[in-house]
């Protein structure tokens, strides 16, 4: 869980920008989207193999 404390004399927009940056760095949002629905292990393996094939060519 990302946590951001608003500093003294810091605008809310700046704090929100720091929070968004920390969330994107940790990959929290991507992980939540990935785990939103159950994915069978066979489908997961298929996606992983397709991604590897895409990287190779």
From Swiss-Prot:
GO biological process: translation
Pfam families: Ribosomal_S21 (PF01165)
GO molecular function: structural constituent of ribosome
Record keywords: Ribonucleoprotein, Ribosomal protein
Chain positions covered by the region annotation Disordered: 35-57
GO CC terms in record: ribonucleoprotein complex; ribosome
PROSITE patterns, per database record: RIBOSOMAL_S21
Lineage: superkingdom: Bacteria
Basic residues compositional bias, start-end: 43-57
UniProt keyword annotation of Cytoplasm present: no
Gene3D superfamilies for this protein: Ribosomal protein S8
Transmembrane regions: none
Annotated family: Belongs to the bacterial ribosomal protein bS21 family.
Protein name: Small ribosomal subunit protein bS21
Species this chain originates from: Bacillus licheniformis (strain ATCC 14580 / DSM 13 / JCM 2505 / CCUG 7422 / NBRC 12200 / NCIMB 9375 / NCTC 10341 / NRRL NRS-1264 / Gibson 46)
